[in-house]
């Protein structure tokens, strides 16, 4: 055992002495003052991490240089310096510049609307100019004129007689009639349409139509365009009210008597007394009335007059049987 201890001491004594001379290896880490900023956003944290990595790389490079110069320090001696990175003013100014540029790129809505309105107005003016520059009159009736065949004297197309034309290509077999007549017309319906249009244009009188419209259900049209009454004037309204009142009174009054008869005073028939039935005077010759033939005797009936034989003179002497036959 002693020999083994001696051998170990002989072999490893030099290394232990060198370790004691050199001392324990210490890792030196330098920390700068850290100030915590909890309000930083995620973008600043990423930038801090990048800066930490760059600082560690730079410090590792400087440490390796010192170790190579001294030769006494090993690769384990690493100096790490952590710096407190704060957002600089340049970054804030950069953000403000970006905001200003973005604001400068934005346009004023009023200016944009005004520019669009001006362009729209310009467009409408150009359209109006184009419409005004057109020489085609849509209300005019075209005239027939064909210079190639030497036909046509400028007559209206509605008054043109088709039979006078030399060429009638629409009558050829297999020809499409729509190539010569529009809107579904053919030769016969076109002629009927032309005659109808000429008749309507001849009978049409705008002034007469307006008079009929202005008359309405009333009478003749006055000078002011109404039925003899100026509705805009107060006197005209009063006259109209008086006419309505007169019409109502006429409807309420009883009918007038015929010509030559006097109208009884009002309330005459209502206040007129009627005579009593018992006080009527007796009629003359009522008591001496004769008894008629085949008449049953009635109670309280007076006797017939003297000399009456029961027969009436002609033409009142008709037998009773003849009256029944008739």
Swiss-Prot record:
Residues 85-98, 127-138 have a biased composition (Polar residues). Residues 30-49 have a biased composition (Basic and acidic residues). One of its GO terms (cellular component) is mRNA cleavage and polyadenylation specificity factor complex. It is found in: Nucleus. Residues 1-18, 70-79 have a biased composition (Acidic residues). It comes from the Eukaryota. Residues 254-267 have a biased composition (Pro residues). Keywords: mRNA processing, Nucleus. Residues 1-138, 215-267, 302-326 are annotated as: Disordered. One of its GO terms (biological process) is mRNA processing. Its main location: nucleus. Residues 50-69, 112-126, 236-253 have a biased composition (Low complexity). Belongs to the FIP1 family. Pre-mRNA polyadenylation factor that directly interacts with poly(A) polymerase. This is Pre-mRNA polyadenylation factor FIP1. It comes from Candida albicans (strain SC5314 / ATCC MYA-2876).
């Amino acid at each position: 055992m002693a020999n083994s201890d001696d051998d170990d001491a002989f072999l490893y004594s030099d290394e232990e002495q060198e370790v004691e001379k050199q001392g324990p290896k210490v890792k030196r880490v330098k920390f700068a003052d850290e100030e915590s900023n909890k309000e930083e956003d995620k973008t600043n944290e990423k930038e801090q991490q990048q800066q930490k990595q760059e600082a560690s790389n730079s410090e590792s490079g400087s440490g390796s240089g010192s170790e190579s110069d001294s030769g006494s320090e090993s690769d384990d001696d690493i100096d790490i310096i952590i710096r407190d990175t704060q957002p600089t003013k340049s970054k804030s100014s950069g953000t403000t510049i970006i905001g200003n540029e973005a604001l400068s790129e934005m346009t004023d809505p009023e200016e944009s609307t005004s520019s669009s309105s001006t362009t729209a107005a310009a467009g409408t003016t150009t359209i109006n100019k184009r419409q005004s520059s057109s020489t085609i009159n849509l209300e005019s009736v075209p005239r027939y004129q064909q210079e190639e065949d030497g036909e046509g004297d400028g007559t209206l197309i509605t008054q043109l007689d088709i039979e006078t034309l030399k060429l009638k290509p629409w009558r050829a077999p297999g020809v499409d009639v729509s190539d010569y007549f529009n809107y579904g017309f053919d030769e016969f319906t076109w002629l009927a349409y032309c005659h109808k249009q000429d008749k309507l244009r001849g009978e049409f009188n705008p002034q007469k139509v307006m008079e009929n419209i202005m008359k309405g259900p009333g009478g003749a049209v006055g000078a002011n365009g109404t039925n003899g009454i100026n509705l805009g004037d107060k006197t005209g309204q009063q006259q109209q009210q008086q006419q309505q009142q007169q019409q109502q009174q006429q409807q309420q009054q009883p009918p007038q008597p015929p010509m030559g008869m006097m109208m009884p005073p009002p309330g005459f028939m209502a206040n007129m007394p009627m005579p009593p039935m018992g006080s009527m005077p007796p009629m003359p010759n009522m008591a001496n009335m004769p008894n008629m033939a085949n008449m049953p005797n009635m109670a309280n009936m007076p006797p017939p007059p003297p000399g009456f034989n029961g027969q009436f003179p002609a033409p009142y002497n008709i037998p009773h049987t003849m009256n029944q036959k008739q």
